């Protein structure tokens, strides 16, 4: 159907075309066009650059329409297939489903990490804007900000009771925050020579581990703030460190393409795991409840015998996720499907699924037993950098380079 422009719209369009021709050096075409369109004088200020702005706006709108169509298609598919309600599914089968419950804005830069508080109905987001924000994930309300770092906050972690929060930053520091009363920074620990990229509590809560671009991992005593151990072995920037639930070992991953398993007490590297073709961005320990599902998946890949674990999942810039039996240093199987870097992994509390966040802007839910993704959430407008699954309640949270934090309900 032919669109009819008003006289005023035609005049503005002609002026915008003339402005575009003139600003891009098409002098002959401009002269001919001005004569044909009967344009005299200079373009109004509001007309300058208008054609380019309109064009880029159309492209953005087309992109948004495509994303909305994908979401609509996903929703229609769920209706047709009769996605069961939460009441008809056991908690072990709840998975996040669109649309998001909340999309939270407030940070002025990319989100680097999102985590749930272990007991309160709170979640935290860390950002490149050097701020940690606290939100109520049930209401979507902003609670407060924790300020103290002077550069990007790279990672955050709670102790097992949620009384202390640890944070680390590109400002080379690790900070401990009182999460019971004051929300104040109670200790600042310095010792790394470069960006501190990851932090994790030992389960007992008396020590904190930090990983850095200086290629070392340090152990800090919570009571004194002193560094009591340094672990060396990686040959490049260490991206993440995560402690096993038993508190005896921990894992680290690096730009050097490797994953290392360490003894907490001895400083010894117990194993080096290699199979990824690029930087290993993230790692996650599998809960004991995942053992059956992982063994069934490994069995179908002809890995003979029952694997005892412990089991670890790793995500890489090579776009793959690998699941390892750390006890024998064996990669049991590979999950493929993401179209860009895998940024973070978290296991479903029921043990049946693994959830991943990626630079392809999606969150994927993986069925471990069948080694395939069963759900894709088109989560953000930009890279999806972080994801966390609540251990008791049906919620997933995600963070992105688009500066937003999203809350997803599971059913």
From Swiss-Prot:
Keywords: Cell cycle, Cell division, Coiled coil, Cytoplasm, Cytoskeleton, Microtubule, Mitosis, Repeat, Transport, WD repeat
Repeat (WD) residue spans along the chain: 106-147, 149-187, 191-230, 233-272, 275-334, 337-376, 379-411
SUPFAM superfamilies: Lissencephaly-1 protein (Lis-1, PAF-AH alpha) N-terminal domain (SSF109925), WD40 repeat-like (SSF50978)
Coiled-coil ranges (or none): 56-83
SMART domains in the cross-refs: LisH, WD40
Domain LisH: start-end pairs: 9-41
GO BP of this protein: cell division; establishment of mitotic spindle orientation; microtubule sliding; mRNA splicing, via spliceosome
UniProt xrefs under Gene3D superfamilies: 1.20.960.30, YVTN repeat-like/Quinoprotein amine dehydrogenase
Annotated function: Positively regulates the activity of the minus-end directed microtubule motor protein dynein. May enhance dynein-mediated microtubule sliding by targeting dynein to the microtubule plus end. Required for several dynein- and microtubule-dependent processes.
Family to which this protein belongs: Belongs to the WD repeat LIS1/nudF family.
Name of this chain's protein: Lissencephaly-1 homolog
């Amino acid at each position: 159907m032919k669109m009819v422009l008003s006289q005023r719209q035609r005049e503005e369009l002609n002026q915008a075309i003339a402005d575009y021709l003139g600003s891009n050096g098409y002098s002959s075409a401009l002269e001919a066009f001005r004569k044909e369109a009967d344009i005299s004088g200079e373009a109004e200020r509001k007309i300058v650059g208008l054609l380019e702005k309109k064009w880029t706006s159309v492209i953005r709108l087309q992109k948004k329409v495509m994303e909305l169509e994908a979401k609509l298609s996903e929703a229609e598919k769920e209706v047709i297939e009769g996605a069961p309600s939460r009441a008809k599914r056991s908690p072990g089968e709840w998975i996040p489903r669109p649309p998001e419950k909340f999309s939270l804005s407030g940070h002025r830069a990319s989100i680097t990490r999102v985590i749930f508080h272990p007991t309160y109905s709170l979640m935290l987001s860390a950002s490149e804007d050097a701020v940690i924000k606290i939100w109520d994930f049930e209401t979507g309300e902003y609670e407060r900000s924790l300020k103290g770092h002077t550069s990007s906050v790279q990672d955050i972690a709670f102790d097992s009771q949620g009384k202390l929060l640890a944070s680390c930053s590109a400002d080379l520091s690790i900070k401990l925050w009182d999460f019971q009363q004051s929300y104040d920074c109670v200790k600042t620990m310095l010792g790394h020579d470069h960006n501190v990229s990851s932090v994790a509590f030992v389960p007992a809560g008396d020590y904190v581990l930090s990983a850095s671009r200086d290629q070392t991992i340090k152990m800090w005593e919570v009571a004194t703030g002193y560094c009591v151990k340094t672990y060396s072995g990686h040959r490049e920037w260490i991206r993440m460190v995560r402690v096993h639930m038993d508190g005896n070992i921990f894992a680290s991953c690096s730009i050097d393409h490797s994953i290392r398993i360490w003894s907490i007490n001895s400083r010894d590297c117990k194993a080096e795991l290699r199979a990824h073709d690029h930087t290993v961005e993230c790692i996650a320990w599998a809960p004991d409840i995942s053992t059956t599902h992982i063994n069934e998946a490994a069995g179908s890949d002809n890995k003979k015998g029952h694997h005892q674990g412990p089991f670890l999942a790793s995500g890489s810039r090579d776009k793959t996720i690998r699941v390892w039996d750390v006890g024998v240093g064996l990669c049991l199987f590979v999950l493929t499907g993401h179209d860009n870097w895998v940024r973070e992994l978290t296991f479903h509390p029921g043990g049946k699924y693994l959830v991943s966040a990626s630079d392809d802007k999606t969150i994927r839910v993986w069925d471990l037993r069948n080694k395939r993704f069963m759900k894709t959430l088109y989560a953000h407008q930009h890279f999806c950098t972080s994801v966390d699954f609540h251990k008791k309640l049906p919620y997933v949270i995600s963070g992105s380079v688009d500066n937003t934090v999203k809350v997803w309900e599971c059913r």
